[in-house]
Design a protein with these regions (language model features):
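Transmembrane beta-barrel strands of outer-membrane/channel proteins
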Residues: 10-16, 61-65, 110-118, 185-191
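Extracellular/periplasm-exposed beta-strand and loop segments of Gram-negative cell-envelope proteins
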Residues: 17-40, 64-93, 116-164, 195-260
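Residues on the lipid-exposed face of transmembrane beta-strands in outer-membrane beta-barrel proteins
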Residues: 45-51, 94-100, 110-114, 167-175, ...
Length: 278
C-alpha cells in the first residue's frame, strides 16, 4: 500500500526569551541594572506545508515572520542625561523539519531554522545637558548659551546580520474538526543566534534647547551633518587593525540572541490522501 498526504497550516503565537543574554543596562543615581532577553521574543506568524510519506513520518517546510518585542538597550535616568533606547526584531525565517505522529492527535517535529531576511531596529532618544566644555565651544563660535542648556537626539538605526543556521523543535496536539480541517496548539523552541554584519541610520536629528525648554536651534545635527564620531553606516568584522578601530564606520562583530520558547495556535487543511492497495 502506498500512502501520501499533503496539508497546509497557518498559525500565530507568542514566544518568550529562552536562556536570555544581556541586551542592555539601566542606570540611575542609585546604581546600574542589567537587562536580559532575546530578540526572538514577540509575536510570530507562520505558514507551513507538510507532506507525510506514511501514517507516521513526514517533512515540513515553513515560512514565518517575527514581530519582536522591545528589548532595552540603554535606559539612563540621571540629572544631566536621560536615555531611552530599545531594539526589536522584524525578521523573516524558514525551517525544514521532520514530523512524527506519536498518535493521531499528538505530533512532534524537529529540524533546521534559518533567518532569511529582516532587521533589528534600534530606536533611541537621548537628552543630554551641555558640558562646560561644550558651552565654551558654542561661546567661542559666537553663540552664548546659559548653563543647563541641553540637546535632544532621536535616531533610528537598522542592524542586519549574517544568515544564521539554528535548530527548531516543537510538540503539538491537533483536534480534527472534520475530515479536512483541524485546529492545533503547539509548544515550539528556537535555538539560534545572529552575528551582526552591518548597521545603517534611517533617521537622525539633534535639536538644541535652552534650560526652560525653548528651542534654540533645530537640526543641530542631521543625517546630512552627523556629529563627530558618528557614521551613517557601520560594518562589523571579527578583526580590526588599530587604525580601523579609530574609524567610526567599523566595529568588532558581536552575536545577538534570538533563541525563544513559545506557544502557537493555528488551523490546518488536509488534502485527501492518496493511498492505494497494490
Amino acid at each position: 500500500m502506498s500512502y501520501a498526504q499533503f496539508q497546509v497550516s497557518a498559525s500565530t503565537g507568542y514566544a518568550i526569551a529562552s536562556a536570555g543574554m544581556k541586551t542592555g543596562e539601566s542606570i540611575n543615581s542609585s546604581g546600574t541594572e542589567n537587562h536580559y532577553g532575546s530578540y526572538g521574543e514577540g509575536v510570530n506568524f507562520q505558514i507551513r506545508g507538510t507532506y507525510f510519506f506514511n501514517e507516521s513520518f513526514g517533512a515540513d517546510l515553513s515560512f514565518g515572520y517575527l514581530n519582536g518585542a522591545d528589548q532595552t538597550i540603554s535606559k539612563v535616568d540621571l540629572p544631566t542625561q536621560q536615555v531611552d533606547a530599545i531594539a526589536r526584531a522584524r525578521a523573516y525565517g524558514a525551517s525544514l523539519s521532520m514530523v512524527y505522529k506519536f498518535t493521531n492527535n499528538v505530533y512532534g517535529r524537529f529540524g533546521a531554522l534559518l533567518k532569511i531576511g529582516g532587521k533589528t531596529e534600534a530606536v533611541v532618544s537621548n537628552r543630554a545637558d551641555l558640558t562646560q566644555t561644550q558651552l565654551d565651544q558654542f561661546a567661542a563660535a559666537g553663540f552664548t548659551l546659559p548653563s543647563g542648556s541641553y540637546t535632544q537626539t532621536n535616531y533610528v538605526e537598522d542592524f542586519h546580520g549574517v544568515f544564521p543556521l539554528g535548530f527548531v523543535a516543537a510538540l503539538g496536539y491537533k483536534y480534527d474538526l472534520n475530515s479536512n480541517f483541524s485546529l492545533f496548539a503547539e509548544a515550539e523552541y528556537y535555538g539560534i543566534s545572529l552575528k551582526r554584519k552591518d548597521s545603517e541610520l534611517q533617521s537622525f536629528n539633534t535639536d538644541l534647547y535652552l534650560p526652560d525648554g525653548t528651542l534654540a536651534q533645530a537640526g543641530l545635527y542631521t543625517m546630512d551633518n552627523l556629529p563627530a564620531g558618528r557614521a551613517l553606516k557601520i560594518t562589523y568584522s571579527d578583526e580590526l587593525t588599530h587604525a580601523e578601530q579609530a574609524d567610526p564606520s567599523k566595529e568588532l562583530a558581536q552575536k545577538v540572541p534570538y533563541s525563544s520558547f513559545g506557544i502557537n495556535i493555528g488551523i490546518t487543511y488536509k488534502f485527501n490522501s492518496a493511498s492505494k492497495v497494490q
